[in-house]
């Protein structure tokens, strides 16, 4: 059952990276 753990970590990392990039690269949407 290691696949679930690996998938969870992968999704968590991807989500964090996506959020960081979205918040840093798109300030116009946040300001709107």
From Swiss-Prot:
Signal peptide per UniProt: none
GO BP annotations listed: photosynthesis
The keyword Thylakoid belongs to this UniProt entry's keyword annotation: yes
Major location (coarse): membrane
InterPro entries xrefs: PSII_PsbT, PSII_PsbT_sf
Transmembrane segments: 3-23
HAMAP family with a match to the protein in the record: PSII_PsbT
The protein's role, per its UniProt record: Found at the monomer-monomer interface of the photosystem II (PS II) dimer, plays a role in assembly and dimerization of PSII. PSII is a light-driven water plastoquinone oxidoreductase, using light energy to abstract electrons from H(2)O, generating a proton gradient subsequently used for ATP formation.
Homology family: Belongs to the PsbT family.
Name of the protein described by the UniProt record: Photosystem II reaction center protein T
Originating organism: Synechococcus sp. (strain JA-2-3B'a(2-13))
